[in-house]
Amino acid sequence: MDIHQFDAIRPFEPTELPEVFDRLLQNEQFLQVLAYLYPGVPKEAIGMKMHQCRTNLDFQKAFCYDFLKNLLAKASLGISSDFSRIDLKKRHTFVSNHRDIVLDSALLHFELIDAGSDTTTEIAIGDNLLKLPWVKDIVRLNKSFIVERSLPMRQMLMASKRLSDYMHFVIAEKNDNIWIAQREGRAKNSDDRTQEAILKMMTMGGEGNIAERLKALHIVPLAISYEFDPCDWLKAREMQLRRDVANWKKGPMDDVISMKTGIMAVSYTHLTLPTKRIV
């Protein structure tokens, strides 16, 4: 496969990073986020550190890992996980329950790095979260690939096939891991049953019969549990509005507020992995 057939959904390639860094450093909203996260640090110093990152993984280690380490030290009682029965030299598709937009995959990355993995994961993220251009840049910089949702049925089938092809491409040819939620969106009612549509999508790519296509993705079930959910009131509000207000839709900043709320109030977290790979 040619990676350019996935240009519309893939993360940025290393050669694209300098241009992305420059674009972000000229965005006022992104600069406001930097000022909040790094008070007193000149944007020039941050820009220099960004441009020293040659790969997406470099960026994750230089910024995301250190940020999470400091955040956990200040705002959390800790995080626990056990990768002892997972071969981190092999590549896996972590199919996870979904509680927090940012932290679910970010904390997995944090624990993978601490466990000695030489990579993190590529993250499946819905295009409904990418209404702001700078947010789209950030997530693609952070090794995210895009799940297209707001499409007509015929286009949706084509998009699902491309998404599945890309996931198989990541495992087989890019030699990287994948994180994907087991259902569309966060489970606001704690119902963590895997949606059949997710599994069906995975079988649209690859080769062989259905079982062989799933097996090729090296699926590992992952459960993440937070002691407290700082976004619980936001989730309850959304569920109530969907119930009581006809045709209610989230605004462009609603998910950004959820991202910020979840990050700044992280609690004790536990990642649960199976004793052996299931598929």
PLM feature spans:
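Membrane-anchoring hydrophobic helices of lipid-metabolizing enzymes
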Residues: 1-109, 113-120, 136, 140-143
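A conditional alpha-helix N-cap/helix-loop micro-motif detector
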Residues: 74-76, 156-161
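Glycine-rich, often proline-containing surface loops adjacent to acidic residues and nearby aromatics
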Residues: 87-91, 140-147, 176-183, 271
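Conserved nucleotide-cofactor-binding alpha/beta core module
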Residues: 122-146, 150
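Membrane-associated lipid acylation/remodeling enzymes share a hydrophobic transmembrane-juxtamembrane segment
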Residues: 161-261, 274
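Conserved small/polar residues in nucleotide/adenosyl-binding loops
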Residues: 269-275
